[in-house]
Amino acid sequence: MIRNVIIGLLAVAVIATGYWGFQEQQQSQILTVQAENGYQRAFHELAYHIDQIEDQLGATMAMNTRRQLTPSLAEVWRLTSLASEEIGQLPLGIVDLSKTEEFLHHLGTFSYKTSIRDLDKEPLTDEEYEKLEKFHDYSKTIKNDLRKTQAMTLKKDMRWLDLNKEFQAQDEPLDNAIVDGFRTMDEHVKGASEVEWGPGMVIRNDHEKKLEKRLEKRKITEEEAKEIALSYVDMEQATDVIVSETGDGLDMYSVIIDDPERQAHYYLDMTQQGGHPIWFLQERQINEQNISLNEASNKAQEFLEEHDKENMQLVDSKQYDSIGVFEFVYLEDNVRVYPDTIKVEVALDEGDIIGYEAMSYLVNHHDRDLEEPELTADEARERLNPRLEVMEDHIALIQNDLGEEVLCYEFFGVINDETYRIYINAEDGEEEKVEKMQEAEPVYDFD
């Protein structure tokens, strides 16, 4: 009898274990499909919005009245913002798109500042029309390069997650149609950096110029750069560490570390002034998930504290296959300081830090004298759409469209099952920014 009971219990345990394994595998497949869907959506929407930018710029050059020019330039600015966001959503850390991003920044700044100007009193100058023509020419180049890359990916049925795996497994420079297409695009738009865009439209990357002003004067040595890099990747010593100086732009050290024990490579850039790591990436095979997203977020927080990044609050977390991506902002007197942002990636198989990006934090972090808000949270809430069901609120410092820091109330709310983040100016009650929060891509099962 006891024997039968034991056999029965073992059978139930085996079935339960099998069911749990099936559930885990199914959940992993769902996350994988969601991640791939997100990448595909961002890529094709990027191509679509670049198309629209080129068309809108072409139409703008033919206009001659403020009634048409102002909304047209505002639309260019809106599309440019969308395109920049979509580039940021793609897993392109292995490709340098700095020139393309710089071009979009210049175009966005020009179109925004021009659209809010009284064009009846201060019409576009001949010089500004020349800039529009150059913007149009470069946007056409980007559009054509993107279309070629898009056609190639559709023809070969290429997947973005395969690109990530290919990158992790590579020993030589990655040879991939997607990567080659984006490299070609960035190479073609390099000429845009040689154009003098006028006041406020600097050739050097704005972030790099601001960062250079904030950094300590003393430059570290290559040996010091090596020691700092090893501490960030949690290694005391390595058999092979290559430190080299970067070329144009901000003076930086690029560090490559070989870790035979983990079968991994590390890539890291840091400033020569002060030795501040800007980003690093660990390249290795990521295996099945062993730790939860919550455990990974704690490891990311501990990593920041170990490297003197105190008072950082987790504001967003996402999971892509077996990788957790976490966004932290600096917290000052209970105010979320969004310009001071750091992103950390954690491998969910071993719980180690595999990615770090701190450019925004390094550029913007400084001592601030935050003023008390003029409005209360309840007064700010009255400025919201009455149909919005508010779920949570915070006090936050953000950058407006002109790059100015503004103290706001941050509200998360729902309308018709859609989640929004809305910023209300804490001084005058104006609506500073409205963002629709991203949702997980749907997974369709036709089996």
From Swiss-Prot:
Could you provide one GO biological process annotation from this protein's UniProt record?
spore germination
Give yes or no: UniProt keyword Aminoacyl-tRNA synthetase: no
Which Pfam families does the entry link to? PepSY, YPEB_N, YPEB_PepSY1-2
Q: Does the keyword RNA-binding apply?
A: no
Instruction: Give the signal peptide, or none.
Output: none
The protein's job, in short, is:
Required for spore cortex hydrolysis during germination. Appears to be required for either expression, localization, activation or function of SleB.
The identity of this protein, by name, is Sporulation protein YpeB
Organism the protein comes from: Halalkalibacterium halodurans (strain ATCC BAA-125 / DSM 18197 / FERM 7344 / JCM 9153 / C-125) (Bacillus halodurans)
